[in-house]
Amino acid sequence: MREMPKYVTGKKWRCMTAANWLHRQAMVASRFGHAAFDIFGVPIFGHEEDAADNFATYIMLQFGGAQARRLIGGAAWAWRAYLGDYRRNPVMQTRLAAFASDHGLPQERFYNLACLAFGANKSEFADVQSYLPPTRLPKCSYEYQTLVRAFRKEISPHIDQEMAKRVLDTDWLGSLESGPVPQK
């Protein structure tokens, strides 16, 4: 909350607070990804941080509909400041040290999240097209399906499917002020 502007009040403040909370939920889901990889011995090709981000994105998308949109939107919210308008200014300067981090650049994390969301449900996330470069859009369905196959093979066998259904059927975000509301 320290990074929130002090002058924002009212509805805009509530929206920003909710977005900040939703982004933090995505970060928690990413930590669960790291734990799952370790506990279940999931083999990782590439950066584990990218795989954990993908794990979190997959989990958020499983809620479907409005909950998935809010979760994905909250996760993307924190990276929005880094993006600007790539159409207006497609060239950016980055310090070389940023490429040495075990975490992807915020821009990369945003685009990966957006592409997976669009690949999961083109109609629900149709507005995401305007954020992704046209060269990335055709690959999004494939990227999401690759993630689905990996999750089903490496993670799903370890999940209590009945409990997962109860979790996914709960309206966790109906109101951020009140508690979760189980669906029947």
What are these regions (language model features)?
Residues 18-26, 48-51, 73:
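Alpha-helical scaffolds flanking conserved acidic
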